[in-house]
């Protein structure tokens, strides 16, 4: 018995390696012949059939995935019972041994136990095979091909349409990468019209040949992008830091526009570094940016060269003019009004240049506030007057030439000195029809608050000011010329910032006159005592020719008149001229070299420009000019067409100023 039991155990243990899973994908098992049709199985063949029956592999008919596991116990029991009935005791016994019923019973028991173990093993094997099949399906490389292509390893897409397939990185080895490269070759260069396409995930481009596949797919595109994205850097030097500031512009506006235009990055030099721009970008863009920078630098160099040529020479004297007949004068203004004269974006100074046909160089921030005006002498004088009048109108800073006049404080009166100025005043040349000028403005001292210039540029064309200190308009002295310009009502009605031309008539004014103040001779009294009539109309005893109109107004009074000129008497207005000094209402020093002195505090108190009695306490709305007392302001508003005497703007009301 022991020997029979050990033999039965050996037979049972012999087919133990059979339940191992087949390599994926598992080959279909060959169909087993039915028990009745085939020959009788003996020994190991019978046990193999029993094991296959236990696994449910003996049924060639298609079944559901879970059916073999469900029918495995019943099939195993039926097979064992049938075979036990068919086999004789001799067949169940091992060869060469006598029949042993106990061994047969032990063998049946062991077969039942092995059947149960096989059932469990079959379930586990089936689950493992399903999981492996799913993994194989997921990790396999899918090649999309037209329906005509038949391959056992390809998956057909209905209709031959190409779709996007996402593959995981698992099990994506070099062999599959090579297959993908081959598929790409078919797609981009094959004879098939529809082609094949391999789809791979980006994270699958890892080790195992995937990098080579990606390079094969995108090699040409990457090379093209590299050729297009090659950048170059070039340094563009400019002459000076001033050129850098000009090219960069205010708050970098110009350099930003250049960057956008050329599609480059331009690094600007900082203060203290060499004036070199560093341009980075494509080669053609860098070349265009370099041309733009060098062109702007050359343009600025030309402008600066012209400024240096026309600018002031050493010693503060005027430079020689560019062309024959041209001259350059300097107009000094306070620091605080430089921007006012220049205007927003240079609009004011450009307008003055266009109106006067001159070239005006504005002062830089680190230099004296002196405007350099170049042009013909008469145009230069017009431009100077425009600048002065613009400051006067915008700031309201006037100086009254009354008994405490400018010459009394600044020393010698230039109009009574010998030399060029005196000869100009005493010349017998006729007065040309020209713009009005103030002779007191032109002092040849470097400390002049109105600038300095050459004397011949002022009087080279025999031009005389018509409201100079000795003009009949000053109402305090007499005229030294042979002729007097005739002023009519049509001339007074013109409202212009620059004083209009006055027609000339041959009317002599050497008639008897009564000077208010005695004259002690030319040059003997350095300070001519100029008296200005404070109130009332023309003096009772005329100091001018009787043919001169009684209704004459001062030319500057045209800016502050309120009524049209008529034949009646008008209120005599004193001479008001702007003060261009820093903090003091004084004029420049005279030719004698004496320094300017500040007027007393009483000079700083402004009186009404209409009545000259009351203090200025009213302003007109909407223009805002505060040059009137409340009584005169109300009179202006009560007129039929109320308008500001200064700017001729329509007035709606007058308001009182509390200061």
Swiss-Prot record:
Region (Disordered): 1-140, 513-569
Residues covered by the KH domain: 232-293, 326-387
Residue ranges with Low complexity bias: 1-15, 64-82
Nucleus in keyword set: yes
InterPro entries on file: KH-I_MEX3_rpt1, KH-I_MEX3_rpt2, KH_dom, KH_dom_type_1, KH_dom_type_1_sf, MEX3, Znf_RING, Znf_RING/FYVE/PHD
This protein's domain notes: Binds RNA through its KH domains.
Entry protein name: RNA-binding E3 ubiquitin-protein ligase MEX3C
UniProt source species: Homo sapiens (Human)
């Amino acid at each position: 018995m022991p020997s029979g039991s050990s033999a039965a155990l050996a037979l049972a243990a012999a087919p133990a390696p059979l339940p191992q899973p087949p390599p994926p994908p598992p080959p279909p098992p060959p169909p087993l012949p039915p028990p009745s049709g085939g020959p009788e199985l003996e020994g190991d063949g019978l046990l193999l059939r029993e094991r296959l029956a236990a696994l449910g592999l003996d049924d060639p008919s298609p079944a559901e995935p879970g059916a073999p596991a469900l029918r495995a116990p019943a099939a195993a029991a039926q097979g064992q019972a049938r075979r036990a009935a068919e086999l004789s005791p001799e067949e169940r016994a091992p060869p060469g041994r006598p029949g042993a019923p106990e061994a047969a019973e032990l063998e049946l028991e062991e077969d039942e136990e092995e059947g149960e173990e096989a059932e469990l093993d079959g379930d586990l094997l089936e689950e493992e095979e399903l999981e492996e099949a799913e993994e194989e399906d997921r990790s396999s490389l899918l090649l999309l091909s037209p329906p005509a292509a038949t391959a056992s390893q390809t998956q057909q897409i209905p209709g031959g349409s190409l779709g996007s397939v996402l593959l995981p990185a698992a099990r994506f080895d070099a062999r599959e990468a090579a297959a993908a490269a081959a598929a790409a070759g078919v797609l981009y260069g094959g004879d098939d019209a529809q082609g094949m396409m391999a789809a791979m995930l980006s994270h699958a481009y890892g080790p195992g040949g995937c990098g080579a596949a990606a390079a094969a797919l995108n090699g040409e595109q990457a090379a093209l992008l590299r050729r297009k994205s090659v950048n170059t850097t070039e340094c563009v030097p400019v002459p000076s830091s001033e050129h850098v500031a000009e090219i960069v512009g205010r708050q970098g506006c110009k350099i930003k526009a250049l960057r956008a235009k050329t599609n480059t990055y331009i690094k600007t030099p900082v203060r203290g570094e060499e004036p070199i721009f560093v341009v980075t970008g494509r080669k053609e863009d860098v070349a265009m940016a370099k041309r733009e920078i060098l062109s702007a630098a050359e343009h600025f160099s030309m402008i600066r060269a012209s400024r240096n040529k026309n600018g002031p020479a050493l010693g503060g004297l005027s430079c020689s003019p560019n062309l024959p007949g041209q001259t350059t004068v300097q107009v000094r203004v306070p620091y605080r009004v430089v921007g006012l004269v220049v205007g927003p974006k240079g609009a004011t100074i450009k307008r003055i240049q266009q109106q006067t046909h001159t070239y005006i160089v504005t002062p830089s921030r680190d230099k004296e506030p002196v405007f350099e005006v170049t042009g013909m002498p008469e145009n230069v004088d017009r431009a100077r007057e425009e600048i002065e009048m613009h400051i006067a109108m915008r700031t309201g800073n006037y100086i009254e030439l009354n008994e405490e006049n400018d010459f009394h404080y600044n020393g010698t009166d230039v109009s009574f000195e010998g030399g060029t100025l005196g000869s100009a005043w005493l010349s017998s040349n006729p007065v040309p029809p020209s713009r009005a000028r103030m002779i007191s403005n032109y002092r040849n001292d470097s400390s002049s608050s109105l600038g300095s210039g050459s004397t011949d540029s002022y009087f080279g064309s025999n031009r005389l000011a018509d409201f100079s200190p000795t003009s009949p308009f000053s109402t305090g002295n007499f005229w030294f010329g042979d002729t007097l310009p005739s002023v009519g009502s049509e001339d007074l009605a013109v409202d212009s910032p620059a004083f209009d031309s006055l027609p000339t008539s041959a009317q002599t004014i050497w008639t008897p006159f009564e000077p208010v103040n005695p004259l002690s001779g030319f040059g003997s009294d350095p300070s001519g005592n100029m008296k200005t009539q404070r109130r009332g109309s023309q003096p009772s005893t005329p100091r001018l020719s009787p043919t001169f109109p009684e209704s004459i107004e001062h030319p500057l009074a045209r800016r502050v008149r309120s009524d049209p000129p008529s034949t009646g008497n008008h209120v005599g207005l004193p001479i008001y001229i702007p003060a261009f000094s820093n903090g003091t209402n004084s004029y420049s020093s005279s030719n004698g070299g004496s320094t300017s002195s500040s007027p007393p505090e009483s000079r700083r108190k402004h009186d009404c420009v209409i009545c000259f009695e009351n203090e200025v306490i009213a302003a007109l709305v909407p223009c805002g000019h505060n040059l009137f007392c409340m009584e005169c302001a109300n009179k202006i508003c009560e007129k039929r067409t109320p308008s500001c005497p200064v700017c001729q703007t329509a007035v709606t009301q007058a308001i009182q100023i509390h200061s």
